[in-house]
Structures are given as structure tokens and as C-alpha cells.
Amino acid sequence: MENKQLVKYNFKTKPFKHQMDALDASHDKKYFALFMEMGTGKSKVLIDNIVHLYDRGEINFALIIAPKGVYRNWVEREIPQHFPDDVQYRVIRWVSNPNKEQEREIKSVKDTFEGITIFVMNVEIFSTVKGRNVGNWLAKRFGSRGIVAVDESTTIKNTKSNRTKALVQLSKDFEYSRILTGSPVTNSPMDVYSQTEFLKKGVLGYSNFYAFQARYANLQTRNMGSTSFRQVVGFKNLDELNKKLDNFSFRVLKKDCLDLPNKVYMPRYVSLTKRQLELYEQIRKEALVLFEDGRLVSAPQMVTQMLRLQQILSGYLTTDDGYQENFETRRIDALLDICYETSGKIIIWSRFRYDIMKIAQVLSDNFGENKVAKYFGDTKDDERSEIINRFQNPNSDLRFFIGNPSTAGRGLTLTEARTVVYYANDFNLDTRIQSEDRCHRIGQNKSVTYIDLISEGTIDEKIVHSLVNKIDLSAKVLGEEAKEWL
């Protein structure tokens, strides 16, 4: 490809060196992959690339597609933070069941606009006919002067899914295409095929998945009754595959980025199931009754109600008589996505014993028991020191430290981790500060990414906002402030 000079413009936020390197590599490419580990700022690189192409007169439309837990970040955080103020733009967020105001905003995409339009959709909607129809209409209407990007592109790794097929087809109508992910391979090198097909059909040199698989996977015929099938038992020619990917990608790990800030905070949004919504509303109304008629509410009463709401977000509820109801939660799926997207060791904090047990089981099932350790009240003293030693050993296979911040949040050194996930936060500010500092100690120059799982429209938002902004919740949840939260 002809290398066109990168247009210099006034960055709204100064890029780190690795971000500038990524922009230099990708700015003029028709298709490109940003393989940048979580916390290295790949969203900013894409935004700067969009602005560059707009400044050069190449595009006036961008379609950004991301998982439900991420696509809201683009609208509320990434675009406002990084898009230059001197560039005229509008952001339209797709909502599956919009209210009247949201519906007007979505329909406004048909209106003439002098600047650049950024349309943000969640990737899950492309599993539906409605989502595919909207995406196809946008592609036909704006694709010739547009760019399409999939954030966390491992969401389209399944070659057989309707979502993947729809997006691979849709991308053909766009002049520019991008994929963004921390790691294009979550389980198997076979994962990269459909992601690269989204960028450009046949870019790896194969007209179909089976030809690609035959080149890079070792296959054996298995018999099951009267039927037989071909099973992947290993991989081959991976150096060749990596060289092909290098032609249209930029890769960076957090450990290689020396100028990142010490602490990077990222929200990950999790929608509630129907059962969670029902129970949450029921308990919320019960809590509000406590405030009626000017009744004096004690701190323990208020904390109990808050805890019950938090339990619902984690997928269970303990009644006054001790009965525990368990139900589906998408929180564990969001955690799994993070674990697959991120390399290296991870700390996962939750205040609830139920969460710790469930997380440990799910991660063991997905990654192996030897990769997982629990550190909470049930953990014996001799096991505790062994867990710390294994986790701190960079050559150890222990990858996931799952703990209660009240038990493990003080005094321990867990500096091998570069990623921390808060599955269910404690209300106590000091507990949060102490737990953050387990993997980030004085004199250390590495960057740590802190990810809070947040269910939109719930007390999660209030809790995380307060803790990240160093507000002591233990004082604020008493009285009228708590009523506002509910």
C-alpha cells in the first residue's frame, strides 16, 4: 500500500509513544488490526485514525461496533475524551428498545450533517434480523465514505454465527475497516480467521475456513458411532501465520509500554436479566418504605438493604429466613470476556463468599484448576502463604487470584498482577484503597488496569463513582443520601 503522509493535527489528548507508533502504522491503511492489550489505549488510536481520515477528506461516517459492556464507554467516555474540539462531529448510540428521545436521535442519522457522524452499536444486535437490517442500511448509505470497526473483535471469532456472517458481509461496503482486541486468539489460532475476513475477504490467502484450517491445524478423524468427524489436535505453521498478520497489524503488551500512567480505571457494563430486574425493583421498593413517614433508619438497616441489592447483581439473594435463591447473571460472562482479552496475572475481588466460589469454579472449568486460587475466610493459613508465593512467581502457572478485599486486601504483595477486576465492591473506602495497592506499590513503575463491573441504573454506579473519587461511602449511605441512591 502506498504510504501517505500522516496529517498532523492538534491531539485533544497527547498520545503515548506506543499509541503514536500504532497510528503511524495504521493511519492510511484500508484495513488494519490493532492487537493492543487492555489498558494500552487502543480506543484513542482508532479515534485519532478516524479524525485523520476525516481531515484528509476520505470519510464522513464511522460505525463502531462493540460488546454491550463496552459500547457505552465509547459514547460517554472515549469519544468525548479524545475527539478534538475543533472537529465537528455527532455521536448516535443504537438502543434496541428506545424511548421517544432515543428514537429521534437514531433516526437523525438520515439528516444531512456537515461534520462526521459516529454511529455506535452493540455487537450482539447483529444476531437479530433487526440489527442486521440496520447495519446493512448504514453500510449501503454511508460505507463508500466510511470506516467500520469492531472493538473486542474476538466476539466475531465464530465463523458459523449469524453475527459473524452479517458483519463480514457488511464490512465489504465500507472503504476502511478496523478490528481492535487485546489478543486475537482466545482459545485457538483458528480464532483469527473470521476476524481477518471482516477486514478483507481472503486477506490471509484462503477462500474459506476449511482451507485455512488445513494449513494451520493438525486434524485427526474421530469416529462416534456410525458418524465420523475431523478434530483439531494441534497446530502448525504458526510462524507463517504470524508473519501474515504482521503485514496489517500492530501489537503491543502493557509491559512494553513504559510511559503509561500508574493506574488506569475502566468500567465494564453488565446488563441485568429479567429475573434480576424484577428482584432488584422489589428490594429497592422495600428499602424505600423504610424512609416513609420520616422514619429514622439505622445504619445497619440501610447497609442490609444495600447488600441485598448487591447480592442480586451477583446472581443470588439470601432471604431473612436464610433461604438462598440463585439465578442467572451476565456478570460472570463479562468476567470471562476480560480474562480471555487480557494476558498475564489477574486479581479478582468480591466481598461475597458466593461470588468467590462461583468465580473459582467457572475459571477452573475454562482455564484449569491449577490456574486458580481462592483467598478468603475459608483459606487455611498454610495455604495462604503458598498461594502468595505461587502468584508472585512469574514462572508459576497460577494466573487468577480470587479474594475478599477485607481478608486479602491488606499487607499482601501481589505485584505480579497488571489487571484487577472488582466483581462486587466493598462500601469501605479504605478497603478499596488497600486492595488497589496490593499490586501497585511505592517505587513501582508499571501500569495497573482496574476494571469495575457495573450494572447500569443500579447502586453499582453510585458505589464505583464514590470509591474511584475517594469518597467514604460508610458515612454517605446513612440517611437522605441513601434514599437518593434508591
Regions found by a protein language model. Give the residues of each.
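Walker B catalytic acidic pair
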Residues: 151-152
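Conserved Helicase C-terminal RecA-like lobe
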Residues: 27-28, 37-41, 45-67, 126, ...
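Conserved pre-motif I regulatory segment
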Residues: 2-35
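Conserved P-loop NTPase motor "coupling/switch" region that bridges the ATPase
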Residues: 59-61, 76, 81-82, 86-91, ...
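Conserved helix/coil segment N-terminal to the catalytic DExD/H
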Residues: 100-118, 123-144
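SF2 helicase motor core recognition
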Residues: 127-130, 187-189, 356-360, 385, ...
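A conserved SF2-helicase RecA2
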Residues: 427-486
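Conserved nucleic-acid-binding Ia/Ib motif block in the N-terminal RecA-like helicase ATPase lobe
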Residues: 72-113, 117-118
